[in-house]
């Protein structure tokens, strides 16, 4: 299996669809895929977009945080051995991401939860910026607030992709053409510098393990759903928003709402997922990425 690891050096980002005043740290793979579709159309029209959608073995993780040399993954939605103290429970709740190499110690209850909780602040900080919107025909600007995440200097987001060499080559080409990701890009959010890096062994994806944690906001196909749910522990996230296309309709229209499994969900059986069409009556399909990459949880946690 061919793979490439990309590091996105962001300053400020606005990710998530829960309103302007909130923002998440990570970026779901479907948000990135939408940007890839837009860039493919810009670079090569419908032909290049068709090539991207036809990449049947291309798999993406969500964009997840790194701090220095450490690549962080979502806290698994899995039972954790604990002494049951209220302090341990409070510390565990503060942990959103942890180094992939520490998954085993976290799940078997030997990790330093205080250190892992403190590590969250090394990613960056949430903040709110005051803005003003000026509308035609109005003298006064309407104030509004935008939530964003500011990364520390040695922190950012990483993406792992697997696929054929030609698929990874197309992905790299498109990524290099994108200037910013997420919302409020005209306000300076989401700009990044892109570099490639060597993927550590702790991030090796697999489908061969008793417990598989998805690194991607994803969804099984209808035929896979029942089997995937057996023994799974998961969180559902609503994916929605407006279509970013000037040719889709004469006015901004929303995508079809869909619920997916959040990254960090744990399954005993892998699934393939797919590329969904979430259009609602517009002039062309609107593609939503829902294929997972899985990471094996240590056997002692299975």
Curated annotation (Swiss-Prot):
Top-level taxon of the source organism: Bacteria
CDD domains for this protein: Csm4_III-A (cd09663)
MF-aspect GO terms: RNA binding
RNA-binding recorded as keyword: yes
GO biological process terms on file: defense response to virus
Keywords: Antiviral defense, RNA-binding
A UniProt-annotated Pfam family: Csm4_C
Disruption phenotype: Deletion of the entire CRISPR-Cas locus (cas6 to cas2, Rv2824c to Rv2816c) decreases resistance to plasmids encoding spacer elements about 6-fold.
InterPro entries: Csm4 (IPR005510), Csm4_C (IPR040932)
Biological role: CRISPR (clustered regularly interspaced short palindromic repeat) is an adaptive immune system that provides protection against mobile genetic elements (viruses, transposable elements and conjugative plasmids). CRISPR clusters contain spacers, sequences complementary to antecedent mobile elements, and target invading nucleic acids. CRISPR clusters are transcribed and processed into CRISPR RNA (crRNA). The subunit probably binds to the 5' handle of the crRNA, helping in discrimination between self- and non-self.
Quaternary structure annotation from Swiss-Prot or TrEMBL: Part of the Csm effector complex that includes Cas10, Csm2, Csm3, Csm4 and Csm5.
Note: Encoded in a type III-A CRISPR locus.
Family: Belongs to the CRISPR-associated Csm4 family.
Protein name per the record: CRISPR system Cms protein Csm4
Organism encoding this protein: Mycobacterium tuberculosis (strain ATCC 25618 / H37Rv)
